[in-house]
Each structure stands twice: as structure tokens, then as C-alpha cells.
Amino acid sequence: MSGRGGRRRGPGQDSGSGQPSPSLSRGGGSRRGRGRVPSGPPPYSSYTPPRPQVAPTQPPPPSAPSTSTAPAYHPLSSSGAESLMREVSQKLTLEPESATTAPLLPPSSSKAIRSAQRPGVGRDGEKCKVRANHFLVKFADKDLHHYDVSITPEVTSKKTNRIIMQQLTDLYKQSHLGGRCPAYDGRKGLYAAGALPFESKEFFVKIIDEDQGRGSSSSATKEWQYKVAVKLVSKPDLHYLREFLLRRHFEAPQETIQVLDVVLRAKPSENYTVVGRSFFHPDLGPKGELGNGIDYWMGYYQSLRPTQMGLSLNIDVSARSFYEPLLVTDFVTKHFKRTSLKRPLSDQDCVKLTTALKGVKVRLIHMAYAKTCKIVGISRLPISELTFTLDDKKTNVSVVQYFLEKYEIVLKHPSLPALQSGSEAKPIYLPMELCQIVEGQRYTKKLNDQQVRALLKATCKRPPDRERDIRRMVSNNNFNGEERVSEFGIHVGQELALVEARVLPAPVLKYHDTGPEKSVKPSKGAWNMINKKMVNGGEVDNWTCVNFSSNYANISNDFCTRLVEMCNNKGMVFRHTAAVPIRSAHPFRIDQTLRDVYEESTRQKRPLKLLIIILPDQSGSYGKIKRICETELGIVSQCCQPKQASKYYPQYFENLALKINVKVGGRNTVLNDAIEKTIPLVSDDPTIIFGADVTHPQPGEDSSPSIAAVVASIDWPEVTKYRGIVSAQPHREEIIQDLYKTVQDPQKGVVPSGMIRELLISFYKSTRRKPLRIIFYRDGVSEGQFSQVLLYEMDAIRKACASIQDNYMPPVTFVVVQKRHRTRLFPTDTASTDKSGNIVAGTVVDTIICHPTEFDFYLNSHAGIMGTSKPTHYHVLYDENKFTADNFQVLTNNLCYTYARCTRSVSIVPPAYYAHLVAFRARYYIEDETSDSGSANARRNARDRNVEAQPLPSIRENVKEVMFYC
């Protein structure tokens, strides 16, 4: 478990205990609204932010050019920026488009797009040394050759492909391969450190089929013959790679890097279970049980990357869930926590078991030879009622009778269904008690809460322990002793990279002038609210509380009294008496109770500004409550865990007050530099900061849409309030589809629309200023998607701006935010260590392990709590604002102290974090339609993935006006 900036209950939830967590996990999507300075009493602070004025629905084009000192938009002179702008200008269309938006297609070529070049390295902050889990890779000048491999009949399994190619190498290494030992990638690529004695050749290889004919009753060993065609394709250039690493070229030779990567992965791929870029095996570390028939295995992640120090091998320890190699009957016992299998499985259990076991390989233990089968389902009837026709096509026999007569086996569990192999047309029925799950199969389904806790407990390692395990993995792998690695002239260093880092200072945070402490400078990523008042307290006039807890049914009045008192003490204006009576209700009546409260407040003409909810004792109701409140009734809600609510801890009430304040339009704190307008570039001109994320369904949810979320700051110069928008899009589509679009209006015809346009207009309504700079933090993008995402989404941003006003093209800085990387930073001395043993908050690295030429950096902006902290990787893909390294690194670090839900700096810049929270919230709005309940929707297969996503339920307007997702 990585070090986190605070405990969390689950992404997007606003209930829980202790300090709300600033750490980030992934999931879902939703919408977000404009915050407002509350009406009523004057602000508590001598600093008063600009109040929104009455504005037209759309901002009118100004009659004269802006008097701002911001330079007019000009493309950068670098060839990278020019090439992108050529692509964008070709796609930019100012005339209205067809109302039917065509699906985005991949560009014909994105090679012309080049990421922003590094504008020098940062110098701000106190220097220190850290170690990184990167190992220097040296390589000799070799004559690399890339060959294409074609195997007939076609094989889809990489494991089988590797067995075939290993057999080919063993048979023909000396006679036909010139004594060379080529490296194979498991698919189409074969690489040699020198020419093979041919340009094109066919080989024939025989291997034993581990499935023994897939259903044949013959005990004879069965062999399969494959034809392998090998043909020369190219000669990757190591010289060009050296030139790139020396920064004499800007385009990374990916093919050459891939060759060396395949060589380093060849031996582990043959010996271990491969999952993406990671390897797992029981010998790589301790394994343990997660429960329900699932184990965890330890392993390691490995990736070869170009860095400033040269090629770097990134190694990190990892853990994954695997099926226990059990008899299927034992798996059923563990999975359903049964003590006996005498009772038949229910229909619901059968659906769950099918989901858990579909695609799993089992070994038949009653056979005299090793035979494996793949499970395609389970029978509808118990095995005692199943019959089939023998091979003579005349005799019909029961499965129970067949096993008794054929194998002299009396089945012990005839009431259980049979496992089904083969096909629907010709099923093969297998008794569960005679099938053992084959070892080494990854469990890809969603882990339950108990399993997640067990996995985190087993894998959460303090920095010294994680560093030790990484060193052990590298030593045990003995890369330099492997035949192919030596043949290719590759040498892997044994020491972690020593990197020069800097610790950026924490920003000064402004609080209310009426509090004893008017500002604070956080220490080691944390501070508290003692003697401080919120810089802008929100107003809550109409509120009430509903308690759905049975175990804590009598706490409602005392709890609300203490919560209201805390909110008022911290600077809010919170009415002491509820608008409608506080009540308790049964959790089975959530829907009706919420509607009753809404109708009662409406009848009394006291519409609720806040509904406090004490959740049921059993989990599972949170999403339902949020969906009803936000999409049906139009009520902002604050949910509380009953166990925590009953303890009356002041810290818990303080945390709730922080969340409630921003939900009703207030601000908790702002950067002092923002008030004094001393943030470089951002304070100079009206600047809007976006955060964007796309979250995808859990594995196995083939019919669920992906959800895109975009948030944007709507206050300037404070940059603390973020309005959010969400949109459903096709399953696992990464590019955000609705950043810009056109729609058909009944009166106006085709009109421009989309997320960016709506948020730009919201900024104008709130500040009466056009944004003259755009900063776009984009989360959730892998390196392979950089070019496409930049091309499409920059194009959408440009079109959205142009749709508001001709020639309106504010300069854009487009930044990818990555948490799903495997770089870890370890302190080298106690002076640069926090109490968790991690590097301190504010540690930034932009040398040695970063890209040779592009503008990227690692920032550890949060204080670790447990485990090893994971820095966030920021990669600036496009920068028309011309930030210096220091300016952008300091801005990003300082923003991490403005997260509204806690008094800790967070691990990821808040706009991206908020986008994640908004997206996760929207997942609750549709979970009833896409839940894994055995419904037709849940069983829909991959052929439905590209259908148009259904629109999300609309969030009520009054809810969208505030940061309801906090």
C-alpha cells in the first residue's frame, strides 16, 4: 500500500472516520457545480472575493481587445508546437457542424506530434539525495535484426507460442540459427543480435498438447505440429538510440528500445506467470490467502525506459490475486463459506459461481494422464439429473452412471451442478469433485472488501523493506547471467539510481481574519484547524437529519447539535434548529423516507440546503442515497458512518464541517499567494484550471459505459472552487468524447455545446472575465495514448474556445497526471525522511530518471502515512504559456494544499482529484442498470461494447451549483 495523505473510506464517499483521505484510487464519474459566496452576514475576513454579478446566459463578445498584459496567442516556434498546431488547425472548424456527432477515429498519423521540450531544470527548494528503483542498463553495439514470426495453425496463447519457439531454438540453434539464441516476444517478433543464416525460412515443430485433445477419451499422448515461418523485417538502429539518449534527437526509437526490453523479459516470461509487465511465481516471495478460494502471489514489475541517465530498468515489487489450486468442491466451500455441500446451490449462487469460474482451467484428477479443460459455464441441472449420448450416438446415459461404470467412481455430491466444458452445442459435463483448478491462473474479478484489506495488509511495506525486496528481486533474477542478455551485450546495474531531488517549501494558507490564527504554513504536509476559521463560511438555513441506523438510533439529536456547533465555531452560519423534524427510519425505506422529507420541506416552503444522513449499519446504501438526492430530489447531502458518528470525536466533526462548507458554497482556505496575486502567470491574467479523468468499469463489466469527468475552477484569482461535468461514453473509450460537440436546438438549429464550452461560460458568469490562460490537468492517460489524446482533446479545446468568440484562442498548457507508474523514491538519510519513513512532502525530481528531453517531473506532494509513498508523475505535453520548470512545479505543489476535504496536502493535484471524485459519483447513478447481478445487462458480451452509451441521469440544477461531490 502506497503512502497516502490521509485515511479514506472509498473514492467519493463523504462519510467515514478520522481525517478524510487525500490519496487517490480509481473508479467512476459525475457532475459538479459552481460555488458561491453565501448571502446573509458579511464575510468573516477582511479579504472579500469578487461576488458573481448577474450575467447573460452566454458571455457577449467584448467590443474591444482585452487590456490584459497577457500576450496574444501565437504558436510556439519549436517544430513540435508547430506540427501540433498544423494538425489542430486542419481539424479546427468554426462553422456549425452536423448535429449528429461522428465517433472519433484515430488519426492517420500522430508522429508529427511532439511533447513539450524541457525548459531547463528546476532550482527552487532545498536540495537532497534520494534513491529511485531504476537500474542503469548499458548496451554494446550489436547488429540487431528483427524477424517476423508466423505460426500455423494460429495460436492465441503467448505461453504456447513461447513453448513452440523454445522448441524451435532447441532443435535448430546450431543447424539453422547460426548458433544464436534469439529473443521472442510471444507474438510476432523475433530478435537476434546479428543476422541469422537466412532472410526467410520455414520450420516445423511438434509439441505435446497439454489438453490431450480437449475432450478425447484416448489416453495416448497427442502431439501437434506447427509450421513456423521466420522472415527478416528490419534492422533496429542502436546508434540512433545512443544519439537520442545524448539528446541529439527528439524522437525516441521505440522499436529499438522494444528489442532490448524483449531480451530482458525473455527468460522471466518463460519461467513465471506474466501479467502485463509484471511476473509472478510462488518462488518470488511469500504467498497467502485472501479468502473465498483466492490467494495472492508476490512478484515484480519490470519496464525498460529512456531516461536522462541512459536506459533505465524500472523494477518494483508487486502482488496479484490468483486462484488457489483447489478441488472445485473445496473452492465452492470457501467461496460461499459453507461447511457442507449437501444443500444444493441457489440460482443466485450458480450465477456467482459461473462468474467466478468461467474461463478457468481445471485438471481432471480421475484420469490416468494429465488432462486439462477450460470451464465455459455450469449446468442448469444438478449432476444427478444430467444425461448425455455416448459416442455410438445410440446410448443415452446419466453422468452419475457413466462415472460409476467407466471409472468405478461413486460421485459424492450429486446435488451440485456439473462444470461445463466443450461448447453449448456439444457440452462436456465434469463433476466438480473430480476437477482441480490449475495453479497459476490470475483472478481478474473484483475483490471484495475483506480481500482488499487482506491484500493491502500483506503488501503494505515501509520504504526500507520495499527497497530491500527490490534489491533482492534484481539479485535473484541475475539478468547479466542470462544467455540472451549476454549475447545482446546488455548489462544491468545492481544499484538503485542515486538522484538529486529538491524539497519545495509549503505555501502559506489564508484563513479568516477573525480567527486567532489568520494564516498557516503547513509542516511536512499537514496542519490543523485549531484557532482557525474558514476563509469564507457558507450559510445553512434549512436543514434536517435522517438516521437510517438501527444500532445507533438514538444519537441523531446529540449528533446534530454537536455538528452544528462545530460548523458555527469554524466560521459557518448554520441555523441551530432543523427546518423539518429530525427522524429515524428503517433502511428498507430509504426511497420513501427521502421523498417524504423533501415533500414536507417543500410544503413548508423551506427547501433544504443540506440533508444530513446517518447511514444504515450495513454498507451498500450510499450510492442509492446520492442518486436519489442529487438526480431526483435536488438535495445536497452529507452522509455519516453511524459508528463514527456515535463517538462524538471533535476531529470527526471538524472533518465533516470542512466538507459541508464547500458543499454549501463556502471556501475553507485559499493560497495566500493567490490573494496577493503573486502566482507567476496564473495571477497575471484570468486563468482557468481544468482537471479531467476517464474512469472505466471493473473487469468483467462488459456492458458498463466509461465515464468522463471534467472540472474547472470558476473563481479567480483564488482558484479553489471547481465546477464539474460528467458524460457517459462507450465502454473503455479513453479519449473524452464530449469536450466539444454540436447539438440540435429546436429553435436555433445546430448549436455548439460540450464540456469545455460550458465550463468556460461558468467561469465568465462567476468572474465576469474571459479566461486568458488555460491549464489542463489530464488524468488517466498511458504513455501509448499521449499523442492521440493530445491531438483530439487539444482540438476540442480550440473548437470550444472558438465557438464562444472568433479568434478567441487563449494559450493552453496540457499536462498528463500519472499515478499508475511504478517509480518509487527512497530517502538516503533521516533528514529527508518523515515519520512514516518516506521522503518528505514537496520532494520533486526532474533529473536522472526523467525523460531525456521532454518536460516531466515526479512530485511527492503528500506526507506518507503507511507503506511507501508513490510520487505523481506530471508530463507536460503542450505548453503555450511557457512555464519555467520552477513555476510549474511550485504551482502544482501549492495547489495540492488546497484540497477541500482535509487539512493535509494530497498526492495528486486537486483538479485531477476532483475529476476523479465527480466521475466516481456518476458511477453510482447507473450502478442499478449495470450491476453484476446476473441480469441480461451484466451478461452482455464484448460485442456490445461499442454501442453508444446511454446518457447519465441529470443532476438537479441547485446541486450542480456547489461542490456536492466533496
Annotate each language-model stretch with its function.
Residues 2-966:
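Long, low-complexity, intrinsically disordered terminal regions
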